[in-house]
Swiss-Prot record:
Consists of two domains: a nucleotide-binding N-terminus that hydrolyzes GTP and a C-terminus domain necessary for polymerization. The domains are bridged by a long, central helix. Interactions between the C-terminus and the following monomer drive polymerization. It is an enzyme of class 3 (hydrolase). It comes from Pseudomonas phage 201phi2-1 (Pseudomonas chlororaphis phage 201phi2-1). Disulfide bonds: none annotated. GO terms for molecular function: GTP binding; GTPase activity; identical protein binding. This is Phage tubulin-like protein. Changing D305R: Complete loss of ability to form filaments.
Amino acid sequence: MPVKVCLIFAGGTGMNVATKLVDLGEAVHCFDTCDKNVVDVHRSVNVTLTKGTRGAGGNRKVILPLVRPQIPALMDTIPEADFYIVCYSLGGGSGSVLGPLITGQLADRKASFVSFVVGAMESTDNLGNDIDTMKTLEAIAVNKHLPIVVNYVPNTQGRSYESINDEIAEKIRKVVLLVNQNHGRLDVHDVANWVRFTDKHNYLIPQVCELHIETTRKDAENVPEAISQLSLYLDPSKEVAFGTPIYRKVGIMKVDDLDVTDDQIHFVINSVGVVEIMKTITDSKLEMTRQQSKFTQRNPIIDADDNVDEDGMVV
């Protein structure tokens, strides 16, 4: 029998978020290219490091050929599950490669999954990785004929990394609640059809899509052009249909479920949200590049008449 849910964390960001969810124990699987992000609390979860790597240094091109051949072995450590949650940074070097490669393998398994991704906004280098990783996910969606559903959290400047990790962990717990198979009127196939909506509606073009997680009907209604919608209610009398989704299902949470913290939660998937994500990333990179173009290029301090030998020594 497959387990209900498996959580996969890749790269430094994934490893950090995993520290907030170690209480989930055996359900948590962490992957990285070096041991520098491994801390004591990771001992209670599954951690696998790639062989022959010492980190990526933010360079996706360098790490890709080193880890790609190892993906089948990594996947062998991941159990069969009814639902998978993947978490990584778009802008790093390790997670932005491991995450999409694992995602592609999950698609081949015909698995149901969503990803939580962090947009790294710290530098033009990170932003370039953000763009390339999003394009990678779009290519995977097309190649695998499956929507790749992501919840995107931008790492905006001035915000602490810890607060971002907390936000992602809280959202992940809501998805874990969604797929715990403890809700009335909601079965495993309802969840699968929600996230893999092109299986049933194959006229829709598989693309990267955005997952919105809202705890009020008003906020859920404000998600534009909702494609697929799944709602949980604690009180069934509060259920009200809204929007114009192609797919909609409802689950009724149980009062005695200790994981329930909200009286309603809405999980809404759309495609147009990705347009705004890409615009934000691209505009941020252009603005940062514009500011960098103003940097002063100083004159060299070596004079033409300096005696410089073949080792660069000035004597």
